[in-house]
Amino acid sequence: MFAKETYVQRRAALKKAVGRGVLLFLGNDEQGLNYEDNTFRYRQDSSFLYYFGLNFAGLNAVIDIDEDREIIFGDELSIDYIVWMGTQPTLHEKASAVGITETLPSAQLTEYLHRAIQQGRTVHYLPPYRPEHKLKLMDWLGLPPAHQEGSVPFIRAVVKQRNHKTAEEIAEIERACDITADMHIAATRFIRPGMYEYEVVAEMNHVAESHNCELSFATIATINGQTLHNHYHGNRIEEGQLFLIDAGAELPSGYCGDMSSTIPVSKTFTPRQRAVYEIQNAMHLESVKALRPGIPYMDVYDLSARVMVEGLKELGLVKGSAEDAVREGAHALFYPHGLGHMMGLDVHDMENLGEIWVGYDGQPKSTQFGRKSQRLAIPLEPGFVHTVEPGIYFIPELIDLWRGQGKFTDFINYDKVEEYRHFGGIRNEEDYLITENGARRLGKKIPLTPDEVEALR
């Protein structure tokens, strides 16, 4: 948690940006795993954390711009709770720590909101992502879940504020990235033939937990790198395979890191693995060189895709104009995801508010396969923190589908692609801060080039 002045300033800026109405913040409650008292790891809503800094369950908050009131709604803990969970700060103490002087019991929130509505005032809320939030909004505001789209002025104001990271936020993110890098470096040194994927996951978890960190998302650690979000960790690791890791640490403050590595299970890459890896490495490095204020990140995505197509042409996998192939979408056979996303208090920062606002500033997204998965398209600005994570994949089911449909035969040499059918996938990822003149990598350097990776094996 930052100093209370940080939260006071954030709320003041938000009030000025929205202008009028009542801003409603729904804090997260505990979630039962398989029964009520056996809960998932608690995680506060990120916008609640950003403006109120309190990582406690059972709280909601209101910023009443019209009446100039800031209120945290919650309940004092019962003696039963204290017996089981220990001494906790009072509600007033929690609120005071973040510059809030007014607290009210949870039961009074419904009445407060109903009164504001009866007065003809607007109650702004952010899009809900938890079922209990949807039920609360239906109860408090009379909105059925299908119509709970959120207040656009509120969403836009939050996105604009949270998109630009302050110096103290950057310091936290850098710490998270340092620990994330340590996780990847430890795994790169640790992997050996005969292990199971879950042993590598345990090694990374040890690094995170030894720094009092949680994971910023469910770890991807797999010999099946062609599966983009593969959370199964039960495979035996064999000589000659590639091992793909996508993992990150989350600090107690909530700020995240997110990096990816691809490692040969053997001491070195095979010639075929190295050839594809070097193409992916070129995609990554050319993308990083292009980072600067003002460049649309969609343009950087297109650049990375063209670099890939040119490299795959040299291997005989594709043919024709790289520019035409990317424009038509043929590249997505090998690169079916985006180049990166915003990162901060969420690993995909503010994704719950809608990519259309966070990464597109309200402009429509492409519907083209591959391109539609680009989460960040807008021109980059100083203070943005985002990932750079191009990849190359050989997905048998996608290859079979496109070949059967006769798709992009002017660009794709399917007979040659068939030779790579069981190759897997390669993705490497770093986190970058956009500066006034360019960009800066956040966190320790992880091995990126084939030689750097092999040096740790």
Roles of regions detected by a PLM:
Residues 1-457:
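Active-site neighborhoods and metal-handling regions in enzymes and metal-associated proteins
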